[in-house]
């Protein structure tokens, strides 16, 4: 897999987060749909981690380890956010859409940083 394809997976995850943030902001409501969207984003990040792991196995000199660790960190934070807005909790407690949008903004910044880390990896001897 090329570096461009790897970055495309990260970009897709970033776009998914952006869509969740826009949905919450526009509705001014956190829904179970948002929970499902975050689960999809988590799955995308899991795919990204798998691709990075495969390439890491091939070349220890590619500089992928930091990207892998950061991908795992972002995935865990998104999983935690999805757990925070789980459907059973949404029925029992009001969750502030503003707070969720702020949390999603933080994760979007983390995705931008991940993209920067992915820029620094080398695959196949090319940057």
Task: Identify the residue ranges that each predicted region occupies.
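Long, low-complexity or tandemly repetitive, helically biased scaffold regions used
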Residues: 2-127
């Amino acid at each position: 897999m090329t570096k461009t394809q790897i970055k495309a997976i990260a970009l897709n995850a970033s776009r998914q987060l952006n869509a969740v943030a826009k949905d919450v902001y526009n509705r001014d409501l956190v829904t179970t749909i948002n929970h499902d969207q975050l689960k999809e984003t988590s799955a995308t990040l899991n795919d990204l981690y798998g691709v990075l792991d495969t390439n890491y196995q091939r070349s220890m000199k590619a500089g992928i380890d930091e990207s892998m660790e950061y991908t795992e960190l972002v995935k865990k934070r998104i999983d935690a956010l999805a757990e925070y807005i789980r459907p059973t909790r949404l029925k029992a407690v009001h969750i502030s859409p503003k707070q969720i949008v702020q949390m999603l903004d933080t994760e979007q910044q983390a995705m931008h940083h991940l993209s920067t880390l992915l820029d620094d990896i080398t695959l196949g001897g090319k940057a």
